[in-house]
Amino acid sequence: VKVHTVEHILSALTGMGIDNAVIEMDANEPPIGDGSSAPYVELIKSAGIVELDVPRRYLEVREAVTIETKGGSILTILPSKQFRVSVTCVGPENRITQYFDAVITPETYEKELAPARTFTFYEDLKPLLEKGLIKGGSLENAVVIRGEELMSKEPMRFINEFARHKLSLIHISEPT
């Protein structure tokens, strides 16, 4: 069985500090909800969080590490006592440039990252549909950008919503 489009669930779990969970599904992808991780945060909170009697294991960053993807994205990890994340999101042809920076805790994740929605550019819709992707996508659960116009039903939730959404999908959690 293959399960697709799990990034919002994984983001919500790790953003809320959960590293051990069982999720049962009766379809090959979870519901899209409102296009953000926020509905999953609410489900996690309503189910409750139970701490295990097993200590967490972490990797300790002792020196700077930089990784660059084939697409040109750059990730730099620096040693720190806090879990601070900064992200700059630049769209095609520099159409959108946004920045977000925060010390991440479950509380800041819930308020500052989880509500940020999926977004795409209008010209990317046809290729995505032809690949059989975004089947549950609509203007109610995604921000669609056409030129300089937002086609979505709801206005932006944050002035830098795209940067926050990209950051939320890194599947973050605060080290303890």
Please tell me what each predicted stretch does.
Residues 1-19, 24-173:
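C-terminal regulatory domains involved in ligand/effector binding and gene-expression control
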